[in-house]
UniProtKB/Swiss-Prot annotation:
One of the GO BP terms on file: acetyl-CoA biosynthetic process from acetate
Family statement: Belongs to the ATP-dependent AMP-binding enzyme family.
Keywords linked to the UniProt accession: ATP-binding, Ligase, Nucleotide-binding
Cellular component, GO annotation: cytosol
Reaction(s) catalysed by this chain's protein: acetate + ATP + CoA = acetyl-CoA + AMP + diphosphate
Taxonomy of the source species: Eukaryota, Fungi, Dikarya, Basidiomycota, Agaricomycotina
Organism of origin: Coprinopsis cinerea
InterPro entries (alphabetical): Ac_CoA_lig, ACAS_N, AMP-bd_C, AMP-bd_C_sf, AMP-binding_CS, AMP-dep_synth/lig_dom, ANL_N_sf
Protein name stated in the entry: Acetyl-coenzyme A synthetase
UniProt KW Transcription keyword: no
Alphabetized Pfam families for the sequence: ACAS_N, AMP-binding, AMP-binding_C
This enzyme's EC code(s): 6.2.1.1
Gene name linked to the record: ACS-1
GO molecular function, one term: AMP binding
Top-tier EC class: ligase
CDD domains to which the protein is assigned, alphabetical: ACS
Length: 661
């Protein structure tokens, strides 16, 4: 973590939100403060009960708003209540305005997408629910979903929820081994997949990968296969069933199963420090409420808005902000099958212009990539429909923030740099469009019901006031907090509740600046201690990326005999940057001086490696853990690399580090 207080001037509230045709849901900072106090005060249950009734339909009323504690790991919200997530996300709106667009499906190839109405979505959801019932799936069973980014993936989620089955969605870029492990762990009886997927003009062999995984999953009795491309695929008679053929044989309506608020809605696997994925369990009532609340308030979504989250449904961002959040409030959501650069770097902006999207939610990795490719791809499109721009996945560096603001938002859109995790279920720290001025790189303020506590890492003491930095925790339960790790509640308690008793441990460092804004400083294990100076890797990376030639960076700490730890940086360069490989030492010196100038001599990297790419997962997350192991001489302990976008880059980096030793 950095030394000294954070000093950044705020940007004014965005013109298109403050002076637009729609009044913001939270229109002044005093309104935010008043509501936030209400949601964490002694009578906060009244606020939560009111919102639960406003935003959700309950088949069975609740009398208790919340019970349980972090210490006991027995948190529950609206426990007597009964509802169905599918009914809340589809039926309500299909009955009210059947022809309204529920899903904008932008297919991989431009021109092949279409819009799906709430009425059509209801028919498809009910049909798939009946197919699952014909397979013998019942309430409490687990169904694995391994689908590409088609609109039918959304229908699969909601079909499971409709009959009380628990869905376990696996990102369609994961390997057969990763899929196998997840299906075995959650004891799936049915898998939903496709013949193939399409992304960036390339085919993804989903069915072939699924078949390889199924060789070691004898408990899976049925495989429902969506025909996406129509290409020949391996087939097991008696087990495999075509989606379109199954749908034709079942009734077009399926009554929703009333679920207890605390019944599991889904299991989603996330990486664990031990290497074994954790099956994070989210329940129905509390999760759905926070999904709806955050879409409405964080993105200022109104009934006729067209919301676009560019994530994959295989991640929590897709679960909450493609599927459950937008549909729970009756908005139009977007399923984007392609990549930001296929067939050209204008693809995102063509999509915004074509559908007149009003909110756009993407990741810093994509924003940095598009910035690197030039703003001319943005400037030729009409993006005037946009009001709110979102960022998710990691803190957005100021350079990317400014580019996003100036070239995509034309300095008139609100930018919400959101912080949350798979385990939190929904956004927990964020700006509020229309109410709060923003600072580039700041996560800003807690969402309703969230009471962050910044603790001194060693003692666990709460650091009060502003200009403090420590470990980020949350002081009280909120509705969408994960309830357990599937099959291992003890691991859940030890990971999140035991490190700082009485608080939920996020695993991230944070600072609160002079204005009370919260800044996420990266994972606690991404903090480097150099001669007693605690440095944030994110801050060093931001300093490096201000160099005109730098595209992306990844900074790690490694053991050093003299200073305890030393800073090592891996850097990729922009394609247009003229670089003589013979002068790598000269460029490295420039970059070191850049960090010394921006942060201070204590933050200067000891070694900089210029590389062609960084090790990333298919979702774009940079795997700094891999870089740490390579530098530490533990390259034989890297584990499974099958989830990487380009596993070959690891070998290239290993050779680079070895040759520089």
């Amino acid at each position: 973590m950095s030394e000294g207080p954070i000093r950044v001037a705020p940007h004014p509230i965005a013109k298109r939100v403050k002076h637009g045709c729609k009044t913001p849901h939270v229109s002044h900072i005093d309104d935010y403060r008043s509501q936030h106090r209400e949601t964490i005060g002694h009578e906060s249950d009244k606020w939560w009960a009111k919102k639960a009734h406003e935003l959700l339909y309950w088949d069975r009323p609740f009398h208790t708003v919340r019970s349980g504690s972090f210490e006991n790991g027995d948190i529950a919200w609206f426990p007597e209540g009964g509802l169905n997530a599918s009914y809340n996300c589809v039926d309500r709106w299909a009955f009210k305005h059947p022809e309204k667009t529920a899903i904008i499906y932008e297919a991989d190839e431009p021109g092949e997408g279409r819009e799906i109405s709430y009425a059509e979505l209801l028919r498809e959801v009910c049909s798939i629910a009946n197919v699952l019932k014909s397979f013998g799936v019942k309430k409490g069973d687990t169904v694995s979903v391994y689908l590409p980014m088609t609109w039918q993936a959304v229908a699969a989620f909601l079909a499971c929820a409709r009959i009380g089955a628990i869905h376990s969605v696996v990102f369609a870029g994961f390997s057969a081994e990763a899929l196998r492990d997840r299906m075995q762990d959650c004891k799936s009886r049915v898998l939903i997949t496709s013949d193939e997927g399409r992304r960036g003009g390339k085919a993804i062999a989903t069915k072939a990968i699924a078949d390889a995984a199924l060789k070691e999953c004898p408990a899976v009795e049925k495989v429902l296969v969506l025909k996406r491309t129509g290409n020949p695929v391996p087939w097991t008679e008696g087990r495999d069933v075509w989606w379109h053929e199954a749908v034709a044989r079942v009734p077009r309506y399926c009554p929703p199963e009333v679920m207890a608020s605390e019944d599991p809605l889904f299991i989603l696997y996330t990486s664990g420090s031990t290497g074994k994925p954790k099956g994070v369990v989210h329940t129905t009532g509390g999760y759905l409420l926070c999904a709806a609340l955050t879409v409405k308030y964080v993105f200022d979504v109104h009934p006729d808005d067209r919301f676009a989250c560019m994530a994959d449904v295989g991640w929590i961002t897709g679960h909450t902000y493609i599927v459950y959040g937008p549909l729970a409030i009756g908005a139009t959501t977007t399923v984007f099958e392609s990549t930001p650069v296929y067939p050209t770097p204008s693809r995102y902006w063509e999509t915004v212009e074509k559908y007149k999207l009003t909110q756009f939610y993407s990741a810093p990795t994509a924003i940095r990539l598009l910035r690197r490719l030039g703003h001319e791809h943005v400037n030729k499109h009409d993006l005037s429909s946009l009001r709110v721009l979102g960022s998710v996945g990691e803190p957005i560096n100021p350079e990317a923030w400014h580019w996003y603001n100036e070239h995509v938002g034309k300095t008139e859109c609100a930018i919400v740099d959101t912080f949350w995790q798979t385990e939190t279920g929904s956004i927990v720290v964020t700006p509020f469009p229309g109410a709060i001025e923003t600072k580039p790189g700041a996560a800003t303020v807690p969402f309703f019901g969230i009471e962050p506590a910044i603790l001194e890492p060693t003692t666990g003491k709460v650091l009060e006031g502003n200009d403090v930095e420590g470990v980020l925790t949350i002081a009280h339960p909120w509705p969408s907090i994960a309830r357990t790790i599937y099959g291992d509640h003890q691991r859940y308690l030890e990971t999140y509740m035991k490190p700082y008793p009485g608080y939920f441990y996020t695993g991230d460092g944070a600072a609160r600046d002079e204005d009370g804004y919260i800044w996420i400083k990266g994972r606690v294990d991404d903090v480097i201690n150099v001669s007693g100076h605690r440095l944030s890797t994110a801050e060093i990376e931001s300093a490096l990326i201000t160099h005109t030639g730098v595209a992306e960076t990844a900074v790690i700490g490694t053991a050093d005999e003299l200073t305890g730890q030393a800073v090592y940086a891996f850097v990729t360069l922009k394609p247009e940057f003229k670089f003589d490989a013979e002068n790598e030492a000269g460029l490295s010196k420039e970059l070191i001086l850049q960090v010394r100038k921006i942060i201070g001599p204590f933050a200067a990297p000891k070694r900089i490696y210029i590389v062609s790419d960084l090790p990333k997962t298919r979702s774009g997350k940079i795997m700094r853990r891999i870089l740490r192991k390579i530098v530490a001489g533990e390259a034989d302990q890297l584990g499974d690399l099958s989830t990487f976008a380009d596993p070959g880059i690891v070998e290239v980096i290993k050779e680079k580090v070895a040759s520089a030793a």
